[in-house]
Amino acid sequence: MIDLYFWPTPNGWKITIMLEELGLPYKVIPVEIGKGDQFKPEFLAISPNNKMPAIVDPDGPDGEPISIFESGAIMIYLAEKTGKLMPADPRGRIRVLEWLMFQMGTVGPMLGQAHHFRNYAPEQIDYAVNRYTREASRIYQVIDTRLADNTYL
């Protein structure tokens, strides 16, 4: 059974959804960020970036346990482990990785910043709010354009 170090963040949910879709058994180990659990040495040994999610799979690729942090790395690992949700053909694989990197490098960070500056910044910074709101709109347009002709990203 895979140990999933989790807190209900967008990246955490990505992994729980994937584990469910793959039908892999897992145990949720809460990492309460409000209490600082992400800074405890035992968690840092698994996720040196002190972010969720992270997993420990006791049945790693060589039969030995493996710990993995960063949601994209976890998703690629799980797809390769099961042979599901990742095309075998090189062109299909490139497309999946391309959109995964788009989500990780563009969607997540930009929407996270938009949310932060709109809802949590200690002071209203119009430049930041406007910049990230415009970028969020641009990102949604990229997604809409892709989905106009495709069932999935």
What residue ranges belong to the model's regions?
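Surface-exposed helix-capping loop/turn segments at secondary-structure junctions
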Residues: 84, 145-153
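Short, local alpha-helical segments
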Residues: 121-124, 144-148
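Solvent-exposed, charged/polar functional surfaces in cytosolic regulatory/catalytic domains
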Residues: 135-138, 142-146
